[in-house]
């Protein structure tokens, strides 16, 4: 994506894959799309089946695991349905953890288990394990 992102304030970023197209959204507006080569489903099973850190689904690092996100991530959600633009806009600030199609929902607000685990708010058990030196920022209000 050839877009400069303004820093110093919160952004809502979403990626939606419908089996043919990958669409990227910023604050509810589509900013990029690309047709995928082979289509089909995306396999995220490595996120939950105990592979080594280098092989797992990760939030805030590149697939090559050498580059890490430099900023704050308030929440992350994984759906097994392609969300519409209207659904993305409606869910920018809040989504019901029991919503149909929501398979993982993590809030990075400092509410963790004793071992640092961030609980999956959906109840599906896809809990997240922080890696490295994590700083949590609590009491953030959705600016949208």
What are these regions (language model features)?
Residues 19-21, 29-30, 63-64, 78-87, ...:
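Acidic glycine-/aspartate-rich tracts in secreted/extracellular proteins
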Residues 13, 73-78, 120:
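Extracellular beta-strand elements of beta-rich domains used
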Residues 48, 89-144:
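Extracytoplasmic low-complexity segments
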Residues 1-44, 63, 131-144:
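Extracellular glycan-interaction surfaces
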Residues 12, 56, 75, 104-105, ...:
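Extracellular/lumenal ectodomain signal focusing on beta-strand-rich modules
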Residues 2-11, 16, 49-53, 65-72, ...:
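Extracellular/lumenal carbohydrate-interaction signature centered on repeated Trp-anchored short motifs
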Residues 47-75, 83-91:
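Extracellular glycan-interaction patches encoded by glycine-rich segments
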């Amino acid at each position: 994506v050839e877009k400069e992102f303004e820093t110093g304030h919160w952004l809502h970023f979403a990626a939606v894959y419908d089996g043919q197209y990958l669409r990227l959204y910023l604050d509810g507006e589509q900013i990029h799309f690309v047709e995928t080569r082979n289509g089909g489903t995306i396999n995220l099973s490595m996120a939950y089946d105990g592979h080594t850190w280098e092989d797992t689904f990760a939030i805030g690092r590149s697939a090559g695991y050498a580059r890490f996100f430099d900023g704050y991530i308030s929440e992350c959600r994984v759906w097994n349905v392609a969300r519409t633009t209207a659904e993305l806009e409606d869910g920018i600030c809040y989504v019901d953890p029991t919503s149909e199609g929501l398979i993982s929902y993590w809030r990075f607000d400092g509410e963790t288990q004793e071992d640092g685990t961030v609980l999956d708010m959906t109840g599906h058990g896809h809990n997240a394990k922080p890696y490295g030196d994590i700083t949590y920022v609590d009491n953030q209000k959705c600016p949208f």
